[in-house]
């Protein structure tokens, strides 16, 4: 479960991490009122769950008199394929220095990892590739307590001046405490701003493990929460893989991996209805990194004609045009293939050929 920035900052503040003053607006009038109350120039920040807002024009600055116009421009615009419905209006804080700090799960080491850098406000992946020595990495045994002196040691290894070590170390310690408390997969501050004597989380990211939501029922009341209906994992590639059954989906992913990179694992399960197919396609198409969708269905209790109708409806209402490669065989396959053929949607019956086609399309885009 990913949190909007304003929601993440509410949690960060509750755990003692300072954030800029501000409020959420859904209209230009609300933005104008918030800016007037702040009485200073403001940052207008699109509230979307995708990354890279700044580069995509989703963060702008305005005076109190100009905030309504800027907000109007951002609302209903799209940032990396996601529609902006709210903006966060925050005081524009003077920046002396930008740092980076995060807590994540290191799946290779099978333990939490603190990452910190004296260079904040940049893409951490780019920094890791360009200057890996500038990132401090500190693994934490999940059976041990993370003590304040350890957080201060991380701040010291960042190369900070001695007067900053207690305050920055304090933020690192608090960030890890909320990371553990809320069963997070990611808790990130980028940038962590030094502004005079203050240390402020200018941005906040929080992603909580979906399997832990039952322990945090307050999250079920939040707009970010979506009840889980698929076995879904977001990956780093550009080819979304959907299948009916974990084995079929993993097999399709293995074939994609021969020459390409999967963007998702999505198992719709057995007996998937027309509506489930439509929602599954809607979900993967909503991710901006997805350039091709590979749907692999071997009909058993899942009927090929239901799958075909779901595909037709999903493509008719899709928010963006993404190439779709379908492998469709099994129960009612003749009817399903007829529906696709009449809708002008190509399909394959060979799994290997379908996977090759998906990779080929992705490489030529």
Swiss-Prot record:
<keyword id="KW-0479">Metal-binding</keyword>
<feature type="binding site">
    <location>
        <position position="45"/>
    </location>
    <ligand>
        <name>ATP</name>
    </ligand>
</feature>
<protein>
    <recommendedName>
        <fullName>Succinate--CoA ligase [ADP-forming] subunit beta</fullName>
        <ecNumber>6.2.1.5</ecNumber>
    </recommendedName>
</protein>
<dbReference type="InterPro" id="IPR016102">
    <property type="entry name" value="Succinyl-CoA_synth-like"/>
</dbReference>
<comment type="pathway">
    <text>Carbohydrate metabolism; tricarboxylic acid cycle; succinate from succinyl-CoA (ligase route): step 1/1.</text>
</comment>
<comment type="function">
    <text>Succinyl-CoA synthetase functions in the citric acid cycle (TCA), coupling the hydrolysis of succinyl-CoA to the synthesis of either ATP or GTP and thus represents the only step of substrate-level phosphorylation in the TCA. The beta subunit provides nucleotide specificity of the enzyme and binds the substrate succinate, while the binding sites for coenzyme A and phosphate are found in the alpha subunit.</text>
</comment>
<feature type="binding site">
    <location>
        <position position="98"/>
    </location>
    <ligand>
        <name>ATP</name>
    </ligand>
</feature>
<dbReference type="InterPro" id="IPR011761">
    <property type="entry name" value="ATP-grasp"/>
</dbReference>
<dbReference type="GO" id="GO:0004775">
    <property type="term" value="F:succinate-CoA ligase (ADP-forming) activity"/>
</dbReference>
<keyword id="KW-0067">ATP-binding</keyword>
<keyword id="KW-0460">Magnesium</keyword>
<dbReference type="GO" id="GO:0006104">
    <property type="term" value="P:succinyl-CoA metabolic process"/>
</dbReference>
<dbReference type="InterPro" id="IPR013650">
    <property type="entry name" value="ATP-grasp_succ-CoA_synth-type"/>
</dbReference>
<feature type="binding site">
    <location>
        <position position="190"/>
    </location>
    <ligand>
        <name>Mg(2+)</name>
    </ligand>
</feature>
<feature type="binding site">
    <location>
        <position position="203"/>
    </location>
    <ligand>
        <name>Mg(2+)</name>
    </ligand>
</feature>
<dbReference type="InterPro" id="IPR017866">
    <property type="entry name" value="Succ-CoA_synthase_bsu_CS"/>
</dbReference>
<dbReference type="GO" id="GO:0000287">
    <property type="term" value="F:magnesium ion binding"/>
</dbReference>
<keyword id="KW-0816">Tricarboxylic acid cycle</keyword>
<feature type="binding site">
    <location>
        <begin position="300"/>
        <end position="302"/>
    </location>
    <ligand>
        <name>substrate</name>
    </ligand>
</feature>
<keyword id="KW-0436">Ligase</keyword>
<dbReference type="Pfam" id="PF00549">
    <property type="entry name" value="Ligase_CoA"/>
</dbReference>
<dbReference type="GO" id="GO:0006099">
    <property type="term" value="P:tricarboxylic acid cycle"/>
</dbReference>
<dbReference type="GO" id="GO:0004776">
    <property type="term" value="F:succinate-CoA ligase (GDP-forming) activity"/>
</dbReference>
<feature type="domain" description="ATP-grasp">
    <location>
        <begin position="9"/>
        <end position="230"/>
    </location>
</feature>
<dbReference type="InterPro" id="IPR005811">
    <property type="entry name" value="SUCC_ACL_C"/>
</dbReference>
<comment type="subunit">
    <text>Heterotetramer of two alpha and two beta subunits.</text>
</comment>
<dbReference type="GO" id="GO:0042709">
    <property type="term" value="C:succinate-CoA ligase complex"/>
</dbReference>
<feature type="binding site">
    <location>
        <position position="90"/>
    </location>
    <ligand>
        <name>ATP</name>
    </ligand>
</feature>
<dbReference type="InterPro" id="IPR005809">
    <property type="entry name" value="Succ_CoA_ligase-like_bsu"/>
</dbReference>
<feature type="binding site">
    <location>
        <begin position="52"/>
        <end position="54"/>
    </location>
    <ligand>
        <name>ATP</name>
    </ligand>
</feature>
<dbReference type="Pfam" id="PF08442">
    <property type="entry name" value="ATP-grasp_2"/>
</dbReference>
<dbReference type="InterPro" id="IPR013815">
    <property type="entry name" value="ATP_grasp_subdomain_1"/>
</dbReference>
<keyword id="KW-0547">Nucleotide-binding</keyword>
<comment type="similarity">
    <text>Belongs to the succinate/malate CoA ligase beta subunit family.</text>
</comment>
<feature type="binding site">
    <location>
        <position position="93"/>
    </location>
    <ligand>
        <name>ATP</name>
    </ligand>
</feature>
<dbReference type="GO" id="GO:0005524">
    <property type="term" value="F:ATP binding"/>
</dbReference>
<feature type="binding site">
    <location>
        <position position="244"/>
    </location>
    <ligand>
        <name>substrate</name>
    </ligand>
</feature>
């Amino acid at each position: 479960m990913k949190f909007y920035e304003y929601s993440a900052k509410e949690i960060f503040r509750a755990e003692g991490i300072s954030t800029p003053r501000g409020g959420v607006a859904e209209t230009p009038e609300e933005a104008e009122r918030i800016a007037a109350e702040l009485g200073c120039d403001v940052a207008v920040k699109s509230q979307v769950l995708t990354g890279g807002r700044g580069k995509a024009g989703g963060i702008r600055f305005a005076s109190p008199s100009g905030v309504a116009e800027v907000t109007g421009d951002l609302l209903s615009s799209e940032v990396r394929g996601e529609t902006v419905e709210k903006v966060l209006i925050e005081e524009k804080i003077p920046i002396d220095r930008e740092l980076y700090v995060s807590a994540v799960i290191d799946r290779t080491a099978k333990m939490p990892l603190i990452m910190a850098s004296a260079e904040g406000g940049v893409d951490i992946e780019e920094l890791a590739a360009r200057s890996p020595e500038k990132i401090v990495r500190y693994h934490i045994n999940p059976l041990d307590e993370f003590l304040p002196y350890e957080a201060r040691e991380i701040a010291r290894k960042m190369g900070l001046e001695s007067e900053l070590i207690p305050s920055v170390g304090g933020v690192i310690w608090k960030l890890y405490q909320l990371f553990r408390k809320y069963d997070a997969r990611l808790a990130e501050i980028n940038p962590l701003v030094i502004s005079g004597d203050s240390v402020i989380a200018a941005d906040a990211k929080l992603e909580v493990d979906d399997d832990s939501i039952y322990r945090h029922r307050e999250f079920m009341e939040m707009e970010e929460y979506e009840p889980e209906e698929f076995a879904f994992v977001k990956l780093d590639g550009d080819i979304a893989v959907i299948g009916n059954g974990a084995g079929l989906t993993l097999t399709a992913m293995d074939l994609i991996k021969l020459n390409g990179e999967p963007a998702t694992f999505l198992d719709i399960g057995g007996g998937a209805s027309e509506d489930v197919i439509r929602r599954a396609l809607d979900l993967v198409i909503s991710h901006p990194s997805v350039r091709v969708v590979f749907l692999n269905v071997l009909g058993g209790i899942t009927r090929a004609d239901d799958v075909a109708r779901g595909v037709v409806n999903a493509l008719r209402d899709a928010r963006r045009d993404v190439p779709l490669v379908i492998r469709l065989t099994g129960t009612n396959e003749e009817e399903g293939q007829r529906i696709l053929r009449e809708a002008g949607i190509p399909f394959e019956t060979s799994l290997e050929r379908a996977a090759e086609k998906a990779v080929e399309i992705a490489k030529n885009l």
